[in-house]
């Protein structure tokens, strides 16, 4: 008698034939090379359905099953976290309440182009199959090239493990370096001078910096074209505490140092906490009653 699993499929399954994107496994070290940062706003009244669609289907079918995509994680910004945003509104989110769900994916160094071509083709295939979710809007979806990292400890959390580590919070900070300032000079100040002074004794375990990359010309049309500004840098701050507990000692102090140095300005600091997979937790806490567009 044929055994079946929980989905009713034959226990003895046949392998699917290879498609146009074969994975060629090499002996390269596991190093972060690039990332996808996608900040999305579900439309009011569709937040539960959006959360379930994304975590049960799109998180995997849109990225995680792709070649050289070795880590991913989802985060959420509740209304109380959005109230911390600085400045608000910002050049990244526009209206204060936008950008409730963030997904970040790590791509293996040296394989960005292979992964990117697969990702665009895959999302187009999902569109054709009716497996996308119409009731949501992209707020900031862009690719980033890994630049550098700085850990609080001498032998601390490496970037490659950051999305798997159980961080209590995350802050995405977008900063523009001063006009005429060389990128290498700004990076050296951040990595070798500013952060070694700021991080000790704070909840900020790791900072990962990344520079914007352009989307492919044939990227899906529902993703707004965001120009890759070469003066703008994204830093991801992985926290041991809730963002509110780290805001003054980490985020505000960082902004004051960057702008006080004359080397740049912070254009957005956006706090998040991890989602809880398999639950609807936080879907009822995305917006406050006085947010623009809140249900009456």
Give the role of each language-model region:
Residues 2-296:
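Macromolecular interaction modules
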